[in-house]
Swiss-Prot record:
Pfam families: NAD_binding_10. This is Divinyl chlorophyllide a 8-vinyl-reductase, chloroplastic. It comes from Oryza sativa subsp. indica. It is an enzyme of class 1 (oxidoreductase). GO terms for molecular function: 3,8-divinyl protochlorophyllide a 8-vinyl-reductase (NADPH) activity. Optimum pH is 7.0 with DV-Chlidea or DV-Pchlidea as substrate, optimum pH is 6.5 with DV-Chla, DV-MPE or DV-Mg-Proto as substrate. Keywords: Chlorophyll biosynthesis, Chloroplast, NADP, Oxidoreductase, Plastid, Transit peptide. Its main location: plastid. The gene is DVR. Optimum temperature is 25 degrees Celsius with DV-Chlidea or DV-Chla as substrate, Optimum temperature is 20 degrees Celsius with DV-Pchlidea, DV-MPE or DV-Mg-Proto as substrate. It is found in: Plastid, Chloroplast.
Amino acid sequence: MAALLLSSHLTAASSSSTTSPTARPAPSFVSFRAANAAPKGARRGWPFLASSVEPPPAASAAQPFRSLAPSETTVLVTGATGYIGRYVVRELLRRGHPVVAVARPRSGLRGRNGPDEVVADLAPARVVFSDVTDAGALRADLSPHGPIHAAVCCLASRGGGVRDSWRVDYRATLHTLQAARGLGAAHFVLLSAVCVQKPLLEFQRAKLRFEGELAAEASRDPSFTYSIVRPTAFFKSLGGQVETVKNGQPYVMFGDGKLCACKPISEEDLAAFIADCISDEGKANKILPIGGPGKALTPLEQGEMLFRLLGREPRFIKVPIQVMDAAIWVLDALAKVFPGVEDAAEFGKIGRYYASESMLVLDPDTGEYSDEMTPSYGSDTLEQFFERVIREGMAGQELGEQTIF
């Protein structure tokens, strides 16, 4: 997989989204609440004690919800305006589920979409504007919208910074579980990541901590189930060089371009798989790694594919991986003296990780990444995505503060 590099902005920016339809007035069912100050994220060495998850109330949704028709199965979605979350909302609506979508009042790249655009984009879901980092606010804002049968959490920290990872990937995700259980949810689908198998980064540790919370809740209450979805790579994270190569520049990669590989999956296919987790009892209480169709591709193969689609001879720039190691060493040293540099050091480690670690399932017997052990799903291919970006550009697939080369 191509390396994830720092953008020119180290501060958090809003996640990307596709262009919204024409704005319309917010309907009466939309809930607004002023965002409270977000709690501080976890610091290294701080213990994290999860608040106990309240059991669902007596008037909760019926537990055997899988016997109900989709039109009778209400699903809560947090992270609904994110890259994957908005496709999950659309897929659930397409299948006939009533959807309660928790959103930020402003979404899209650098918050360019206001509340009206958010409501229009997620229609006909019931949109609830709330602060997922504030447990009390989230529960209060959602209280009029129960009961629900299942929940899908698509939350993710925007850049993977140390405190932001614990604030969002763990704490806000825990708040989603607490609120969902309070409204009667009997199943919880977590959008995690395949890279948590080898946790060297703060956001991976935060995600793993919450995965443990889900397992503990299922152990405490046998009527509750979960599905942990661990996708490989997203198409948009591999499309950052299409425009530059199209404009005549070489394709940039680390080492020989064979340090890592991935089986990328489209947002539509991943959303369909996540929706399957609600209705398919065979996916309950399981960790589900998932990739797209076809064989795993190295950065070298991705570059060769791109040049072939453009009808050009391949031209590559091969960057020694040691360049990143040196930068990380310097940033780590600075972070010990200047705490404000801590996130910059973490971002460097994220880039190094994605430059050298495959987004595939780890074979427990060999300790190696395995293409064969990584399940495939869907029909959308990276080649089709590249063809579309060559024709139409990256509109709706902007990378925000996470930029590939």
